[in-house]
């Protein structure tokens, strides 16, 4: 009889704690600095990593606590993209969501100051030895021919191939 090997994975996106929601609101209202917001976020990430490890996970995430959307925050912070308000909202389980989206506004490139770098460095710093930290990033397919996100490529690129090459590199 052969032994069945199971493989499990998790995205690592957790519900945002109330303390983080409140800190984000205070930051948005100018009541606290970004540094103060990150202090709250970091403490909650540290607690989450402890919880993940305590519950047997060998691969941990930061809960995506630094994001407002699982995918758009990553794209907004690449060079060559911008956030904008679209007319219609996303539909999720029949409910309307925010209308924020992303579109091209220049040549696409890696942003060396992307906040995901900082967040991942912090995650690594609070991850115990023998445990693997991970981050989830969206694939290029979330740009290509979706929600008109790639419609403006010809404003900045001579060819579709050049656009795809830069997108893949970023």
What are these regions (language model features)?
Residues 1-170:
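Domain-level signal for soluble alpha/beta catalytic cores
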């Amino acid at each position: 009889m052969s032994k069945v090997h199971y493989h499990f994975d998790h995205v690592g996106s957790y519900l945002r704690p109330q303390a983080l929601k409140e800190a984000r609101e205070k930051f948005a209202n100018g009541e606290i600095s970004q540094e103060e917001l990150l202090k709250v976020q970091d403490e909650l990430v540290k607690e989450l990593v402890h919880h993940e490890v305590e519950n047997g996970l060998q691969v941990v995430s930061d809960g995506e606590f630094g994001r407002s959307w699982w995918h758009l925050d990553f794209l907004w912070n690449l060079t060559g993209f911008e956030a904008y308000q679209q007319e219609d909202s996303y539909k999720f389980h029949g409910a309307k969501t925010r209308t924020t989206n992303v579109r091209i506004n220049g040549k696409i490139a890696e942003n060396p100051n992307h906040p995901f770098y900082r967040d991942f460095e912090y995650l690594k710093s609070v991850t115990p030895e023998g445990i693997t930290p991970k981050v989830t990033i969206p694939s290029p397919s979330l740009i290509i021919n979706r929600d008109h996100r790639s419609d403006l490529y010809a404003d900045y690129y001579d060819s579709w191939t050049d656009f795809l090459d830069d997108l893949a590199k970023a």
